[in-house]
């Protein structure tokens, strides 16, 4: 087995047309040793734990401030306008950065994403703010 030299960051972002989309970015793991590859140290503005019950589903909304979301338990589905969705399982993450463009009024038919708990297990997430 070889070492990973990059970490794939899944990003939920607001595109130029106002719609939320997913993209992937690579973060170099250029520090540390071959046995323990590290990224640079990221600044953070705190963290928050959340649990969501079986059956939870939000309405369309935008992220208030960019933050990482790590799935600790259960499964979380993120849905976008147009029917695209993605399910995240324990150990997976996404970087939520689909903020409302400055000067724009929120339109639930255009902006944001919805989230929901999937399956029979409680959803447990960790949010880490920039």
What do the predicted segments below correspond to?
Residues 2-14, 83:
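Short acidic, Pro/Gly- and aromatic-enriched capping/linker segments at domain boundaries
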Residues 53-56, 74, 80, 100, ...:
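Short acidic (Asp/Glu) patches
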Residues 65, 87, 109-111:
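Ubiquitin-like/PB1-type beta-grasp interaction modules and other compact soluble beta-rich domains
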Residues 16-60, 66, 121-125:
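A short glycine-rich, His/Asp/Glu-containing loop-to-beta-strand
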Residues 95, 105-130:
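A short hydrophobic beta-strand segment most commonly corresponding to one strand
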Residues 82-100:
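Short acidic-glycine-tyrosine-enriched beta hairpin
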Residues 64-82, 92:
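Glycine- and acidic-residue-biased ligand/ion/polar-headgroup-sensing regions
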């Amino acid at each position: 087995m070889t070492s990973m030299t990059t970490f794939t960051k899944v990003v939920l972002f607001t595109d130029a047309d106002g719609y939320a989309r997913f993209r992937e970015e690579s973060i170099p793991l250029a520090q540390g040793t071959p046995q323990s590859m590290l990224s640079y140290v990221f600044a953070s503005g705190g963290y928050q734990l959340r649990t969501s019950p079986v059956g939870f589903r939000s309405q369309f909304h935008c992220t208030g401030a960019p933050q990482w979301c790590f799935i600790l338990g259960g499964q979380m589905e993120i849905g976008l306008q147009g029917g695209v969705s993605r399910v995240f399982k324990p150990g997976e993450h996404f970087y939520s950065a689909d903020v409302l463009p400055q000067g724009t009024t929120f339109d639930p038919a255009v902006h944001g994403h919805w989230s929901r708990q999937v399956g029979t297990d409680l959803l447990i997430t960790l949010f880490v703010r920039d």
